[in-house]
Amino acid sequence: AFHNYLRERDIPWQVEDLAGAHAQVKQLEHELEKRLSAPDAPELICSVFAVGSEVVADALVSTGKAGQVMVIGNDLFPESALALRRGIFTNIVYKDPTSLAYRGAKTLGDYLLWGRTPTVPVQKGAVEMVFASNVDRYCELAGI
């Protein structure tokens, strides 16, 4: 959807999707370090999962690029909050996991116990952007 959005609006950004999920962390780490060391290194990195955020922070530090590349990390946890405070990340995308878990459990319970199917097949939750200026408040809310 993101690539289509850019194409439809003629936005001239070059976007690279790097492979690497939980089972491919070393591959992601290698690819990131290679890209960050290249002459045409990325100007912005967006991570879409918590482990990826950790890998991005580590790669930025190991290549000496921390604070030189805009980075949007994903999920608020102690290491991502520290990366934001230290200027390694520019922002963090925050999704309230307690609220999402509650809604998921309720939806599943309603289905299993009462046979009620959800009114919409995909439920969406609020997404908030955390900045260095408000990270302490979000950490307090999240119990970090």
Per-range role (PLM):
Residues D17, G73, V93-Y94, F131:
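Structural signal for conserved beta-strand scaffold positions within catalytic alpha/beta enzyme cores
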Residues L32-E33, R86, G109:
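Short, surface-exposed amphipathic charged segments that create phosphate/polyanion-binding patches used
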